[in-house]
């Protein structure tokens, strides 16, 4: 199993110039789409690798995904590190890209990536020891059955709303809940279980994401037009 992590240095002058060149000027950019916090770097990313080394030394490879940037302290010769630039796996018609959703929907295209992998953002840190079975059981992703009420009141929440619409086109609403109710209403979730009591349109609870690469391929097969439209947006607003 591999780990995949996305990183960008929003303070890099070259990155700022490139981003400004492609920022639309014919409409107002929503703060959810483009703000300094979306591309922020607090100078703590090296601790992400230290936490992996400490809490998951068994991981196969770590794929660091960037637009070509790399931290100055990064040891690119480490045997477990695979530094991958956007142009190495994202179709050229999508580039340049400042849309994390478009980057994530192409992760399965990375050469050499294991079938089972876990996707992190650079602000998601391991804080205790983990093992393979924390992420996959019988080669299936181990997920949290916790849902939050979802209302597309902002451009960012519309991303989750669109994701749910796609899922509902292929999977009956609440079928899993009816088949396995105790996976949704389990005392191990503590107070988080209360989220599942809401009856609104539901989106996922935000945490790390464990995937199988073939799922990405299947989604592109069934929803290629939708993903193409999303992927050609430089900024994250669909």
From Swiss-Prot:
GO terms for biological process: polysaccharide biosynthetic process. Keywords: Exopolysaccharide synthesis, Transferase. Its EC number is 2.7.-.-. GO terms for molecular function: transferase activity, transferring phosphorus-containing groups. InterPro entries: Stealth, Stealth_CR1, Stealth_CR2. It comes from the Bacteria. The keyword Zinc does not apply. Stealth proteins are part of a protein family that is conserved from bacteria to higher eukaryotes. Family members were first identified in microbes as proteins that help pathogens to elude the host innate immune system. Microbial stealth proteins are involved in the biosynthesis of exopolysaccharides. Stealth proteins are predicted to function as hexose-1-phosphoryltransferases. PANTHER family: N-ACETYLGLUCOSAMINE-1-PHOSPHOTRANSFERASE SUBUNITS ALPHA_BETA, PTHR24045. Belongs to the stealth family. This is Capsular polysaccharide phosphotransferase eps5J. It comes from Streptococcus thermophilus.
């Amino acid at each position: 199993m591999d780990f995949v992590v996305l990183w960008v240095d929003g303070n890099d002058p070259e990155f700022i110039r490139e981003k400004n060149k492609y920022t639309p000027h014919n409409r107002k950019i929503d703060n959810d789409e483009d703000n300094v916090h979306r591309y922020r770097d607090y100078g703590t990313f090296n601790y992400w690798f230290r936490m992996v080394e400490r809490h998951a030394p068994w991981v196969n490879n770590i794929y660091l995904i960037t637009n070509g940037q790399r931290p100055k302290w990064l040891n690119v010769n480490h045997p477990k590190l695979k530094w991958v630039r956007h142009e190495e796996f994202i179709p050229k018609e999508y580039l340049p890209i400042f849309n994390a959703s478009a980057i994530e929907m192409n992760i399965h295209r990375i050469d050499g990536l294991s079938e089972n992998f876990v996707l992190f953002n650079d602000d998601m840190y391991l804080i205790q020891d983990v093992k393979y079975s924390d992420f996959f059981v019988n080669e299936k992703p181990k997920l949290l059955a916790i849902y939050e009420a979802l209302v597309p009141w902002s451009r960012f929440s519309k991303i989750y709303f669109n994701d749910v619409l796609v899922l509902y086109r292929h999977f009956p609403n609440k079928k899993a809940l009816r088949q396995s109710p105790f996976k949704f209403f389990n005392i191990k979730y503590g107070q988080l279980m209360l989220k599942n009591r809401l009856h609104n349109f539901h989106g996922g609870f935000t945490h790390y994401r464990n995937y199988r690469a073939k799922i990405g391929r299947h989604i592109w097969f069934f929803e290629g037009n939708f993903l193409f439209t999303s992927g050609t947006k430089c900024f994250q607003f669909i």
